[in-house]
């Protein structure tokens, strides 16, 4: 009985490779020093699931799946190019200018017997084309036009709302406090209202991207004249540098960039090494908004914006900055009502109905723009 068993054991031993392993390769893999157990994007989703499920309740599953799905874009027409022919080409794609559609709708309401919408005090001359609800078509990449400038700029169409809300008027002096990568700066220039525009960002690499956008879309005489100034200063100190200077200020602050954080590992604020930076974001945001308000002339307006869903970075920051200016500078600031934006742009965006102050575009599979929070503030004389 023992002999057959021994023969089987010998056969098995012949099949097994007992080649010795060099000592330097014999180690136990340690995840902490090799690949992270959780990627930054996974940590972001984990964080959002914990916080936003409480903040948004039953809406969170819908927002979540939309954030994880492909984003929609709008095409901001370059008014410095042959904008009329560009608009015609975009219309041939069955896209519509959502800004002009909203304004036309507002003008028709009194004739239809509906209650009139408050006057849309928005920045003029902006043309941004989007595909209709549920249409997931994509715009072709922008091309160099006949005038040597790019035809249109692809962006999250919700990013145009803070610029519209700023309500620029001809001859305004304007500050874009956190300007890079440049989409909103370009939109500000498209209005044709800026007598002077200061575009600032602390990061020199990001202002380099901003300069490239301006070079591709804006004529040389405007770029190199006195109309546009690009700087890389600490935005928190702007109230000291140029206090009481600007008619309108856009404060599009650094934030958790929720959609980006779920899709990109590079430069993700949910990296473990950036935990302290992430925790300090609300304080930085309050400081930047306060600086923007101090840089505004008495009677001027500021729009605060983020691409985050977090009320800690949105409503709470607005309230914190208002209290800071009242207590430390004896400056009164009033939040302006933008609820009519929800009515005017409801065909293009999905708005969260329960913001304490300001407006919030939430991602929705039918209209997958955002997130984008924006709030308009009036520095009282």
Curated annotation (Swiss-Prot):
Matches recorded under Pfam families: Methyltr_RsmB-F
MF annotations from Gene Ontology: mRNA (cytidine-5-)-methyltransferase activity; small ribosomal subunit rRNA binding
Phosphoserine PTM sites in chain numbering: 203
Transmembrane intervals: none
Superkingdom, taxonomy of origin: Eukaryota
Transit peptide limits: 1-25
Catalyzed chemical reaction(s): a cytidine in rRNA + S-adenosyl-L-methionine = a 5-methylcytidine in rRNA + S-adenosyl-L-homocysteine + H(+); a cytidine in mRNA + S-adenosyl-L-methionine = a 5-methylcytidine in mRNA + S-adenosyl-L-homocysteine + H(+)
Subcellular localization, as worded in the UniProt entry: Mitochondrion
Gene Ontology cellular-component terms listed: mitochondrial large ribosomal subunit; mitochondrial matrix; mitochondrion
EC number: 2.1.1.-
Record: active site: 307
Keywords: Methyltransferase, Mitochondrion, Phosphoprotein, Ribosome biogenesis, RNA-binding, rRNA processing, rRNA-binding, S-adenosyl-L-methionine, Transferase, Transit peptide
Disulfide bonds: none
Phenotype caused by lack of the gene: Embryonic lethal.
GO biological process, one term: cytosolic ribosome assembly
InterPro entries: MeTrfase_RsmB-F_NOP2_cat, MeTrfase_RsmB-F_NOP2_dom, RCMT, SAM-dependent_MTases_sf
Positions of S-adenosyl-L-methionine binding: 182-184, 201, 206, 234-235, 252
Subunit (UniProt): Heterodimer with MTERFD2/MTERF4; this interaction seems to be required for NSUN4 recruitment to the mitochondrial large ribosomal subunit.
Family classification: Belongs to the class I-like SAM-binding methyltransferase superfamily. RsmB/NOP family.
Summary of the function given for this chain in its UniProt record: Mitochondrial RNA cytosine C(5)-methyltransferase that methylates cytosine to 5-methylcytosine (m5C) in various RNAs, such as rRNAs, mRNAs and some long non-coding RNAs (lncRNAs). Involved in mitochondrial ribosome small subunit (SSU) maturation by catalyzing methylation of mitochondrial 12S rRNA; the function is independent of MTERFD2/MTERF4 and assembled mitochondrial ribosome large subunit (LSU). Targeted to LSU by MTERFD2/MTERF4 and probably is involved in a final step in ribosome biogenesis to ensure that SSU and LSU are assembled.
Name recorded for this polypeptide: 5-cytosine rRNA methyltransferase NSUN4
Annotated source species: Mus musculus
Encoding gene per record: Nsun4
